[in-house]
Regions:
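Active-site microenvironment of metallo-dependent hydrolases
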Residues: 1-183
């Protein structure tokens, strides 16, 4: 991670079957300078996706979303700044439309306060980062995917290297299995 160069850690966790599958990579151009943002709204599989500057804030944001049975959370310095619980499939809430709109606007302001760039929707950006049917690079529970070549890539940054261990899974919408040879 290098927030000074606008590079933060990104992680996607499988949240439906308890498989423990995860993908870890990096996100550039998001603007985050502190804290973490997590959401269970992540197309198409709606797994848990977290972007952050520190592992501890990422873990807290992810845990807040897990405890809420889905949602959107913003964390800074070990403090949960805000959460929109989405307990219906991790995508919906019994709250009124007005209450949801107000909470989303509050969370967007909080994310902007952490450095998310103006003009970027912090939550929809994360929702599409994991969608492995649109070019070019996407991160899902299989790892970093080169969508056009349909390959899992290794991720490294400086001395840190991440090996995404899940192989043999399906790329959503591709109809092809990823084989260990393509890793």
């Amino acid at each position: 991670m290098d927030p000074a160069r606008d590079i933060v850690k990104l992680a996607v966790f499988e949240r439906h079957k308890g498989t423990g599958h995860k993908g870890v990579g990096f996100l550039g151009g998001y603007g985050l300078k502190a804290g973490a943002v997590a959401t269970s709204v992540a197309h198409d599989s709606h797994n848990l996706i977290v972007a952050g500057v520190s592992d501890s804030d990422m873990a807290l944001a992810a845990e807040a979303v897990r405890k809420a049975e889905g949602g959107i959370a913003v964390v800074k310095g070990g403090t949960l700044l805000g959460i929109l619980p989405l307990p219906i499939g991790g995508l919906m809430t019994p709250m009124t439309a007005q209450a949801v709109d107000e909470k989303l606007e509050e969370l967007k302001r909080l994310a902007a306060g952490l450095g998310v760039r103006e003009g970027i929707d912090p939550f929809m950006t994360l929702a599409f980062v994991s969608l492995p049917v649109i070019p070019a690079l996407r991160l899902n529970t299989c790892g970093l995917i080169d969508v056009e070549r349909q390959e899992i890539l290794e991720v490294s940054f400086g001395e840190t290297q991440f090996r995404n261990e899940k192989v043999g899974g399906k790329l959503y919408g591709s109809g092809e299995n990823i084989s260990p040879e393509r890793k």
